[in-house]
């Protein structure tokens, strides 16, 4: 199984949240070997979604040329997506929220 982990903490490897995530992943590795890749969202160049919906008329391709294209390909090839983040003001950190907003292109079109 291929697992893609999104670390949304601005503290990257020093994040308490990521330490908990590693404990969870260690348990999964003990149960059955997994291929695990971690993306530190803070280290990636991901522009804000413009809300233009060009992706809905452009075969699911976003018009913004940044690292999100590569990330979307990794997401689509993964068997499991794991979002690891601390709560900031009862929500996810801004960088991870930005990534989630940019996940729109591969979604099926709505009526």
Spans of features found by a protein language model:
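N-terminal beta1-alpha1 ligand-phosphate binding loop
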Residues: 1-32
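Short, glycine/charged-enriched secondary-structure capping and boundary segments
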Residues: 18-21, 51-54, 96-99
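Helix-loop-strand module that forms the ligand-binding subsite of alpha/beta enzymes
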Residues: 63-111
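Residues that form or flank phosphate/diphosphate-binding pockets in enzymes
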Residues: 15, 47, 91
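N-terminal beta-loop-helix "entrance" segment that forms/cooperates
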Residues: 38-60
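Structured helix-beta-strand junction loops
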Residues: 31, 58, 77-78
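Surface-exposed, flexible loop/turn segments at secondary-structure boundaries
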Residues: 11, 44, 90
């Amino acid at each position: 199984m291929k697992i893609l982990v999104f670390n949304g903490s601005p503290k990257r490897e020093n994040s308490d949240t990521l330490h908990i995530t590693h404990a969870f992943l260690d348990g999964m590795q003990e149960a059955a070997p997994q291929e695990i890749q971690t993306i530190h969202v803070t280290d990636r160049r991901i522009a804000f979604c413009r809300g233009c919906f060009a992706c809905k008329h452009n075969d699911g391709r976003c018009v913004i040329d940044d690292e999100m294209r590569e990330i979307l390909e990794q997401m689509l090839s993964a068997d499991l997506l794991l979002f690891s983040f601390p709560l900031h003001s009862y929500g996810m950190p801004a960088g991870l929220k930005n990534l989630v907003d940019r996940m729109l292109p591969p979604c099926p079109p709505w009526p």
